Amino acid sequence: APTATPLVADDSTIRTAVALWFSNRAAADATYGPISRWETGEVTDMSNVFGDAWSFNDDIGAWDTSGVTSMNSMFYGASSFNQDVGGWAVDCVTDMEAMFWYASSFNQTLGWCVDDGVRLSAAFDFTLCASTSCGVKQVAGGCGGCGPPIVDAARRLAGASSALLALALL
């Protein structure tokens, strides 16, 4: 059987595709390809995408989240979810409130560093990793940059060049 071209999602189509995926997974796979391969780089709002999806536990770790600004309640009540999403780019996210609330199987160390202005209220409540905030730390000014990767890389390179120049002048 031919393989579907993976979905290239935006804020609207991701919700349509997820709804189909839950109501008729075979049809969703035939239409959009496997959920693990969906192209999500154009999505900015992932709020509640898997809200109350108590049986969801598929691998979406390769999703491109670099443009996402809201993950509010993304896995709210997704009590079976325990996949590694630590590789997600979350530099642009400003709202993670209740992101994993009652995702009671979730026990991953995410390793994310986010700006101290990111809304994290109840983000990890009732998860197995709540006591450690699932490895998420907040830092004033964030830890990266929000923008196209080339711009962020240029900023880091410029900062490194300045530091090397300062050392050379000592």
Regions found by a protein language model. Give the residues of each.
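Negatively charged
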Residues: 2-151, 159, 164-170
